[in-house]
Curated annotation (Swiss-Prot):
Residues given in the record as Zn(2+) binding sites: 268, 271
Catalytic residues (UniProt): 56
Protein's UniProt name: ATPase get3
Keyword set includes Endoplasmic reticulum: yes
Gene that produces this protein: get3
Lineage of source species: Eukaryota, Fungi, Dikarya, Ascomycota, Taphrinomycotina
Source organism of the structure: Schizosaccharomyces pombe (strain 972 / ATCC 24843) (Fission yeast)
UniProt cross-references to InterPro entries, sorted A to Z: Anion-transp_ATPase-like_dom, ATPase_ArsA/GET3, ATPase_ArsA/GET3_euk, P-loop_NTPase
Compartments (UniProt record): Cytoplasm; Endoplasmic reticulum; Nucleus
Length: 329
């Protein structure tokens, strides 16, 4: 049974006032960062405070806005209520380990305990994720938008709360089994092993992570915006991503299709061939995802860099693009 297609804009996200977490992701090179920056600009018009955070080690936010961002949130120039930050999960866990070493520089068991903890698959990235959430929570933003790493990393990132909850359970078991032995070894060697420092810190994250896990699975609070281009590989990757998001119980009902050639009157042979291919895959996207908001964004003539260019691009996410019927752009 067919029904009228949903509006091809992201206006629905602006209207959903309960949203707290918005993830933007897709294959590399499809305009993911441009889309997340533009969405953040539009959200800042309707929310009191918005944080745009990059978890992609490539860190394109700085390039997009032409302003250097780092691991601490700072205001985006030209906005009073939009901040941005760039975090490398791998660096975060490295810093956490260094801090532990600085606190116990003479403890020979400190490294052993960390090695023991980090043998659990995914625990390093999961702990880094917990550190990110801790920072965000202390800042009290009304809405947080994640510019995520390319697809595979994104899906792993979204599964971190579950990984961490399981890991903490395992660590709790390790603590009860090996804690007395470690303390005994410490007393023999004349040092304070204090394994509770490490296990205690991880255990204290459990309630926090458990709450976030629930929020991520609540469609009133969390959604994922898929970004793609109208080509076979991108369509395939988007389908795989949506299936995995569904298995993680994470809501997704918006797809942004970038770089479309929409001029029906072009006489350029290469453009005509590419447009024909794009129209074929666009028809498949619309058929597969008839219950999604499919946002069609045209190929723009220049790179979208700088605040003004992003503001202009962002309008195409909230108003359906109509190709001019006469004259040239």
């Amino acid at each position: 049974m067919s029904f009228d297609p949903l509006p091809g804009t992201l206006e629905n996200l602006l209207e959903q006032t309960s949203l707290k977490w918005i993830f933007v992701g897709g294959k590399g090179g499809v305009g993911k960062t441009t889309t997340s920056c533009s969405l953040a600009i539009q959200m800042s018009k309707v929310r009191s405070s918005v944080l745009l955070i990059s978890t992609d080690p490539a860190h394109n936010l700085s390039d997009a806005f032409g302003t250097k961002f780092g691991k601490d949130a700072r205001k985006v120039p030209g906005f009073d209520n939009l901040s941005a930050m760039e975090i490398d999960p791998n660096l975060s866990i490295q810093e956490m380990t260094e801090q532990a070493d600085q606190q116990n520089p003479n403890n020979p068991l400190s490294g052993m305990m960390q090695d023991l903890a980090f043998t659990i698959p995914g625990i390093d990235e999961a702990l880094a994720f917990a550190e990110i959430l801790k920072q965000i929570k202390s800042m009290e933003f009304d809405c947080v938008i994640f510019d995520t790493a390319p697809t595979g990393h994104t899906l792993r990132f979204l599964n971190f709360p579950t990984v961490l909850e399981k890991a903490l359970g395992k660590l709790g078991g390790l603590s009860s089994r090996f804690g007395p032995m470690i303390n005994q070894m410490g007393s023999i060697m004349g040092v304070n092993a204090n394994e509770q420092d490490l296990f205690g810190k991880m255990e204290s994250m459990r309630a926090n992570i458990s709450e976030v896990n629930k929020q991520f699975k609540n469609p009133d609070l969390t959604t994922f915006v898929c970004v793609c281009i109208s080509e076979f590989l991108s369509l395939y990757e988007t389908e795989r991503m949506i299936q995995e998001l569904t298995s993680y119980e994470i809501d997704t009902h918006n797809i942004v299709v970038n770089q479309l050639l929409l001029d029906p009157n072009t006489t350029c042979p290469q453009c005509m061939a590419r447009r024909k291919m794009q129209q074929k895959y666009l028809a498949q996207i619309e058929e597969l995802y008839e219950d999604f908001h499919v946002v069609k964004v045209p190929q723009v003539p220049a790179e979208v860099r700088g605040t003004e260019a992003l503001k202009s691009f962002s309008e195409m996410l909230v108003k359906p693009y109509v190709y001019p019927t006469s004259g040239k752009e």
